């Protein structure tokens, strides 16, 4: 009996030990350390989720075994969506930090909106005469004294300085080639309105003319492009009234631009942000036009972060208090905040890596610190988003009806003198202390902030995706019979006209930017499936070019399954049309440029503007009931694996950049 008791005791001890250690052995690596927030009762900062390590396929294995059939209950897709709408809802992807953009089903509340601060300044001022990049001047922000203590031809006081290099180079605001890309990115992100920064009473009419015409062009093609709001500043009253009159004349009075008005409260009343004294002057004016302004416009009030008064119906473009305050449903989310007014003050300002650590008991305001190691994750911006995401849906409808993001493309600030020797900038400084969402080539920033913005817009403003039915259909791949393709709900659109030739001057200096890599301008992608194959019908704006021997960048189809694991190349498991022979293409399982293995053949047929590709499900590890993939189509993108930012700047990519389309969710 004693022996039996001893055995049972040992077994019980063994089971207790296994219970303790098993969570530690459930994955091959421990989660990444998050910032220390032990001083807080709760941690309001959302860190990028970390991927658990997965088992790498054994040597010589071309494809993991087909997973067991998932149990997914699907429903008919009765939504009446255009291809453009379907595309925006089915954006997907995963960034280097493991953050995920998931497809969505539609807006939770059609009366909530996301706005973006949009700037028009580059190349428009007399001090925009050269290219001065603070990140390069300070050797990737490692020697700040090179900027703050010197006034030389390398970094002259009084000149506008870039905080870093934009993905399209140091571009001029009138470069329509760049502007087309911007409109595409903002539309695909789900941004509802642009707020034009004219707060210094400069209207940049040569820039806005290009912007408005391009917005109208894409709107006429069926894209739900962002609408437009002007943001006017407070200076001399008479001068401010004159600026208001001019804005009315060049934009709001023109019938051609009426479809670009942002009208959230009344379809006949465009929103405009104006100083409180200008609005009051119109209400009291005896001037006929000014009296009409009072009833014509939906006014919001210009709100500066340093003002003592929070205006009724205010529209803050930044908030120095955390959590941010709502002003009659308008709340600002900024990537960084220059709370000491001097963004060069890297101790006092809140950079991209700032996160809240402790809440003051009396005011409820949070204090925090800058994480100089993890600023590329935009911890600050995520904390700003969390202010909204932590609200209930009812609170969001009341306090976050207008989520206003600062900002998209500011890029420059004037170098100013502080005393005899010190120099500074006000609004933006270096990559860590900058507030642009537009992708950058500086200091490893890439497009992380843009990616995170889409993720949060999806989480905030949209309902989770639904498992819809994708009825089986088998097209004849030997001809372009559009009949069967028309039965598919899964038709995705790409912007066209945005991959033409580029030839425009930089913001300053003698540099001229040129690009002629645009070749096949991708228009639509329609996907079908049956019990054995996936089918893709890709159309371009013009006839698809013939494949040339040795061209690995011709009409590539990149694929990632829902069960992707192990090493991926640029985030993708498979590529089609990397190796083409006649009407056949190898389906390459790709781990790196030096490790590509064929897992089968795809059929590829071209019919003028259309290409039809047939891929065996089995080659991708998929099956009749398990066919979820993310995909991207690219043409002539240069060196995309080593430099994925080239997906924004060379050839054509559908969808743009590091985004994918989702099929079969």
Model features per residue range: what roles?
Residues 5-17, 25:
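Sec-dependent N-terminal signal peptides
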Residues 18-37:
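Sec-dependent signal peptide cleavage junction
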Residues 32-71:
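N-terminal, intrinsically disordered, polar/charged segments of Gram-positive cell-envelope systems
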Residues 69-474, 552, 598, 624, ...:
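Glycan-processing catalytic domains of CAZymes
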Residues 117, 197, 229, 526-528, ...:
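Residues within well-ordered beta-strands of beta-sheet-rich folds
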Residues 475-584, 636-645:
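Surface-exposed, glycine/proline- and aromatic-rich loop segments on solvent-exposed faces
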Residues 523-526, 599-604:
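Beta-strand-rich interaction surfaces with strong enrichment in secreted/lumenal proteins
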Residues 607-653:
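Ser/Thr/Pro-rich, low-complexity mucin-like regions
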């Amino acid at each position: 009996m004693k022996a039996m008791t001893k055995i049972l005791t040992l077994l019980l001890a063994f089971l207790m030990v296994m219970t303790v250690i098993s969570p530690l052995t459930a994955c091959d690596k421990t989660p990444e350390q998050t910032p220390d927030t032990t001083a807080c009762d709760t941690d309001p900062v959302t860190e990028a989720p970390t991927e658990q390590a997965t088992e790498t396929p054994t040597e010589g294995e071309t494809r993991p075994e087909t997973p067991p059939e998932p149990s997914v209950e699907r429903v008919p897709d009765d939504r009446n969506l255009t291809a453009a709408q379907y595309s925006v809802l089915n954006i997907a992807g995963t960034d280097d930090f493991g953050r995920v953009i998931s497809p969505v089903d539609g807006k939770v509340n059609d009366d909530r909106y996301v706005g973006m601060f949009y700037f028009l300044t580059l190349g428009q001022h007399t001090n925009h005469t050269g290219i001065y990049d603070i990140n390069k001047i300070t050797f990737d922000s490692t020697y700040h004294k090179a900027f703050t203590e010197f006034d030389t031809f390398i970094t002259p006081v009084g000149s506008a300085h870039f905080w870093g290099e934009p993905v399209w180079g140091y571009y001029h605001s009138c470069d329509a080639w760049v502007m087309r890309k911007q409109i595409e990115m903002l539309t695909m992100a789900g941004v509802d309105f642009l707020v034009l920064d004219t707060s210094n009473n400069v209207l940049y009419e040569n820039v806005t003319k290009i912007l408005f015409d391009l917005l109208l062009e894409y709107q006429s093609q069926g894209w739900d492009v962002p609408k437009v709001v002007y943001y006017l500043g407070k200076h001399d009253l008479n001068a401010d009234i004159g600026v208001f009159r001019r804005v009315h004349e060049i934009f709001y009075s023109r019938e051609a631009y009426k479809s670009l008005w942002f009208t959230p409260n009344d379809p006949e009343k465009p929103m405009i942000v104006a100083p409180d004294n200008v609005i009051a002057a119109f209400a009291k004016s005896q001037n006929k036009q000014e009296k009409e302004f009072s009833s014509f416009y939906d006014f919001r009030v210009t709100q500066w972060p340093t003002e003592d008064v929070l205006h009724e119906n205010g529209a803050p473009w930044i908030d120095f208090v955390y959590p941010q305050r709502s002003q009659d449903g308008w709340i600002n989310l900024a990537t960084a905040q220059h709370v000491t007014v001097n963004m060069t003050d890297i101790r006092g300002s809140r950079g991209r890596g700032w996160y809240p650590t402790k809440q003051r008991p009396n005011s409820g305001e949070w204090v925090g610190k800058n994480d100089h190691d993890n600023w590329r994750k935009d911890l600050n911006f995520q904390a700003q988003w969390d202010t909204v995401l932590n609200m209930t849906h009812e609170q969001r409808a009341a306090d976050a009806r207008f989520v206003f993001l600062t900002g998209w493309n500011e890029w420059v600030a004037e170098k100013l003198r502080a005393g005899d020797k010190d120099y500074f900038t006000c609004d933006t400084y270096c990559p860590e202390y900058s507030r642009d969402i537009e992708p950058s080539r500086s200091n490893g920033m890439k497009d992380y902030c843009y990616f995170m913005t889409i993720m949060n817009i999806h989480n905030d403003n949209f309902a989770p995706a639904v498992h819809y039915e994708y009825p089986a259909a088998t097209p004849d791949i030997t001809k372009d019979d559009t009949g069967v393709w028309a039965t598919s709900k899964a038709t995705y659109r790409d912007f066209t006209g945005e991959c033409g030739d580029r030839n425009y001057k930089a913001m300053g200096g003698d540099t001229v930017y040129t690009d002629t890599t645009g070749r096949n301008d991708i228009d639509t992608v329609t996907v079908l499936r049956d019990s054995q194959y996936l089918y893709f019908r890709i159309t371009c704006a013009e006839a698809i070019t013939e494949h040339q021997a040795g061209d690995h960048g011709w009409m590539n189809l990149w694929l990632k399954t829902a069960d992707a694991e192990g090493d991926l190349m640029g985030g993708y498991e498979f590529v089609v049309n990397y190796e083409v022979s006649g009407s056949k293409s190898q389906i390459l399982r790709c781990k790196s440029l030096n490790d590509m293995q064929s897992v089968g053949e795809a059929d590829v047929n071209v019919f003028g503007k259309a290409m039809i590709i047939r891929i065996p499900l089995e080659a991708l590890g998929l099956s009749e009931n398990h066919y979820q993939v993310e995909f991207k189509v690219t043409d002539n993108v240069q060196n995309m694996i080593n430099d994925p930012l080239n997906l924004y700047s060379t050839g054509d990519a559908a969808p743009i950049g590091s985004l994918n389309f989702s099929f079969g969710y």
